[in-house]
């Protein structure tokens, strides 16, 4: 009331120091004359290349010790090149623009190419990118849009998905030295001992795999033992992709056994084709497959890979039971080929072999299965019976039921 104070907004924005005192980085196209005035390096002298023969063991910035490299003539004046280099974020903040015009020798990117390709449909990365790299990238796009009205791009990424980490238990010996899973063994799955001298191991919490804690798993070893498809299947089946994956040998073995079951199911399909029966439940099988196509397509769009794997377990149980009943050859081929196509992103090597064996029964069409909407339409309609405005009953009747 006494008007002794006034409103003021203090922004927490600060200048961003983009230079670094190190060799590995993009040279800054700035030089200094003998009076220490700033001089722009002419475009015809760009790009500036870093010296290849350099001693990285010197104190401070290694480029400060490269006298010959720093000496440059600009407009007949002796100048000294800037020895600071740009932070790596400066380069990584607009690399996707360069991908649009990779062969352009005159400019970093072409506006017409940007209009055609950008923005990026989907960005997938660690959660730390959301507060660093993506923030810088957006700033660059805003700045370019501000400086060039033809740029017309402010949001570089339409979608962001941050995946979880792969985790594993940690192990230490009696001297608190980290141990790798290959250096220990267990007979009961609870108590662990060292392979070398049979000393009990301290089991720590499950943490994201890292070389420092030595809780990593060699993927090549897993692939050699179980196959690439089993490794791929387990990683996607264990948990939602935005959550951490808890690595376990039991989980790997479970995925491996499921692929074996799928192979036996494949053999049943091949055997069933030779019978050429008249199907009693062809319509039900086709309806089930179309429902599965719809589920998996929707789950793919929302990155629900673990739910898709659960759908495949249900699919196995359904067809393992249905193959005991008569199915027409046409229905069998059409539905099974679609099933293999649905499986292909998850177990590509397996489905490639299966489709090869099915090649004589089908056209060479590897497009993603489409849902037949008519088949999925409900055959029944719901009729609500009201008397004097009050609901008395609900009837579920077939669409083709007559008035009588």
Model-derived segments and spans:
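C-terminal low-complexity, glycine/proline- and small-hydrophobic-enriched intrinsically disordered tails
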Residues: 246-253, 303, 310, 317, ...
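S-adenosyl-L-methionine
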Residues: 280-284
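Structured secondary-structure scaffolds
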Residues: 1-271, 288-320, 334-341
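Long, hydrophobic, amphipathic alpha-helical segments used as structural scaffolds
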Residues: 270-273, 304, 323, 347-354
């Amino acid at each position: 009331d006494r008007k002794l104070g006034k409103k003021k907004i203090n922004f927490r924005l600060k200048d961003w120091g983009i230079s670094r005192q190190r060799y590995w980085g993009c040279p800054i196209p700035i030089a200094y004359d003998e009076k220490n005035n700033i001089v722009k390096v002419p475009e015809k002298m760009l790009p500036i290349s870093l010296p290849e023969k350099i001693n990285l063991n010197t104190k401070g910035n290694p480029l400060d010790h490269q006298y010959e490299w720093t000496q440059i003539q600009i407009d007949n004046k002796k100048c000294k090149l800037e020895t600071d280099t740009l932070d790596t974020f400066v380069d990584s903040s607009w690399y996707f623009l360069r991908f649009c015009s990779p062969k352009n020798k005159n400019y970093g990117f072409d506006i017409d190419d940007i209009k055609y390709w950008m923005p990026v449909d989907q960005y997938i990365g660690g959660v730390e990118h959301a507060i660093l790299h993506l923030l810088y990238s957006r700033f660059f796009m805003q700045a370019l849009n501000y400086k060039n009205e033809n740029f017309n791009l402010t949001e570089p990424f339409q979608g962001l998905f941050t995946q979880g980490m792969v985790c594993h238990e940690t192990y230490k010996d009696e001297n608190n030295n980290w141990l790798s899973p290959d250096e220990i063994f267990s007979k009961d799955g609870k108590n662990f001992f060292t392979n070398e001298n049979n000393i009990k191991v301290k089991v720590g919490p499950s943490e994201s795999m890292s070389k420092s804690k030595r809780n990593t798993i060699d993927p090549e070893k897993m692939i050699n033992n179980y196959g690439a498809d089993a490794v791929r299947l387990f990683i996607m089946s264990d948990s939602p992709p935005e959550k951490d994956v808890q690595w376990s040998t039991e989980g790997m073995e479970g995925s491996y056994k499921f692929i074996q079951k799928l192979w036996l199911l494949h053999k049943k399909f091949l055997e069933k084709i030779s019978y050429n029966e008249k199907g009693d439940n062809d319509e039900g099988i086709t309806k089930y497959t179309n429902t599965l196509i719809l589920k998996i397509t929707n789950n793919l769009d929302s990155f629900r890979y673990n739910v898709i794997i659960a759908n495949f377990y249900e699919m196995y149980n359904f067809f393992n039971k249905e193959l005991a009943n008569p199915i027409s050859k046409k229905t069998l081929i059409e539905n099974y080929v679609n099933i293999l196509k649905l499986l292909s992103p998850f177990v590509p090597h397996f489905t490639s072999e299966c489709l090869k064996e099915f090649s004589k029964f089908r056209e060479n069409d590897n497009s993603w299965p489409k849902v037949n909407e008519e088949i999925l339409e409900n055959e029944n309609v719901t009729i609500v019976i009201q008397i004097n405005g009050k609901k008395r009953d609900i009837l579920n009747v077939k669409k083709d039921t007559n008035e009588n």
